[in-house]
């Protein structure tokens, strides 16, 4: 493994995350706190009151399925289209809508053999800056939002009429394909440019699963586009297969990836309810120093992912997610695992060095046969 200790001098505190955790620190020593629920009336404890707003009453409406005009619930027909009005929840589901979620990178070539000595040398020399990385994040965000805009127009979607799960689902599908599974114990997973979600679960868990798995996709895209930029090639399945290999065949890189997704998910859920098992199993394979720096790198990736997501998941939608979470849960929060959180990030210079270490070591140690098998999945 590369010497990641050289990144120690670039570590700095993530003040925003520290402040969020500091708000609940007094609760970490308590065994539990109880949330009493009765339909839409919530009695929040001190922490939940800070994190959630009260549910606002929403006027009941109906929508014309043809022109999408909104009517009071007492109306039955659209006078212009002469069709029966429907309640928003009875409209065609976002689940069944096909969206073009293509995210591209345009280079000057389309090499079918990425793992050449010349390319490995280019990766190791790493002519890449933080400005290049910011351009990549902006490009991915712009393409995703264009896909979202096209989907809304092509399907005449009324965003205001969607529930919070459908809004998050629509946003996720603008970046990556989403499919549903009805077996296994996992809430969901990301694999070869597809997110799989168990739709038997509560809405709140489907929402956080979508955010978690979308984060895996975006981190993968960051590294794919970085590689394409350095090698000056179009995005293709060869590059994607190499990056999937790098992220999945090293406990260190897997922890970076998993902790990043965990940290992003935590931005949109409620402290005390998040599942930590996604990364605790991985970190058992690493010593404490490698665990700390892997989490710091993952947390830095998470900052960029969160900023991208917050372009759509603004304050109001984040509060809607938290409110949905409280409506669904009957469990008491457990703050003890917050001690596993990492509140550090890397400076710009340190972050670029971290990406260099990940890619240079990964390219040099790639198993070509495994990469070929991965290529067949795209």
Where on the chain are the PLM-derived regions?
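Short alpha-helix carrying the canonical HExxH Zn2+-binding catalytic motif
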Residues: 203-219
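Short cysteine-rich clusters marking metal-coordination/redox-active sites
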Residues: 64, 78-81
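Pan-zinc metallopeptidase signature
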Residues: 278-378
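An active-site-proximal "capping" alpha-helix that borders the catalytic cofactor pocket
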Residues: 254-269
């Amino acid at each position: 493994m590369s010497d990641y200790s050289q990144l120690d001098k670039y570590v700095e505190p993530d003040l925003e995350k520290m402040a969020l955790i500091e708000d609940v620190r007094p609760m970490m020593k308590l065994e539990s706190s109880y949330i009493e629920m009765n339909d839409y009336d919530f009695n929040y404890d001190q922490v939940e009151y800070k994190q959630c707003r009260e549910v606002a009453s929403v006027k009941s409406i109906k929508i014309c399925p043809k022109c999408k005009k909104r009517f009071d619930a007492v109306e039955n027909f659209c006078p212009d289209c002469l069709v029966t009005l429907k309640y928003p929840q009875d409209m065609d589901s976002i689940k069944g809508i096909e969206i073009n979620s293509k995210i591209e990178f345009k280079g000057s070539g389309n090499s079918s053999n990425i793992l050449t000595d010349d390319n490995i040398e280019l990766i190791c020399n790493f002519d890449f800056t933080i400005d290049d990385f910011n351009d990549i994040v902006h490009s991915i965000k712009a393409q995703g939002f264009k896909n979202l805009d096209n989907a809304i127009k092509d399907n005449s979607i009324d965003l205001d009429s969607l529930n919070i799960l459908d809004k998050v689902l629509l946003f996720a599908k603008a970046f990556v394909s989403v499919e549903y599974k009805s077996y296994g114990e996992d809430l969901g997973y990301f694999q070869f440019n597809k997110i799989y979600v168990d739709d038997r679960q509560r809405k709140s868990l489907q929402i956080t699963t979508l955010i978690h798995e979308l984060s895996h996709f975006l981190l993968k895209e960051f590294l794919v586009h970085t590689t394409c930029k350095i090698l000056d090639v179009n995005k293709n399945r060869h590059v994607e297969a190499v990056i999937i290999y790098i992220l999945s065949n090293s406990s260190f890189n897997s922890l970076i990836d998993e902790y990043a997704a965990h940290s992003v998910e935590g931005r949109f859920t409620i402290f005390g309810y998040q599942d930590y098992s996604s990364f605790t199993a991985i970190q058992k394979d690493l010593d404490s120093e490698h665990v700390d720096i892997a989490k710091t790198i993952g947390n830095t990736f998470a900052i960029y992912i969160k900023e991208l997501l917050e372009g759509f998941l603004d304050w109001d939608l984040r509060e809607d997610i938290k409110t949905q979470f409280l409506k669904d849960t009957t469990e008491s929060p457990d703050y003890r695992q917050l001690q596993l959180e990492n509140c550090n990030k890397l400076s710009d210079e340190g972050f670029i060095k971290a990406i260099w270490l990940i890619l240079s070591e990964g390219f040099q140690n790639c198993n070509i046969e495994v990469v070929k098998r991965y290529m067949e999945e795209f």
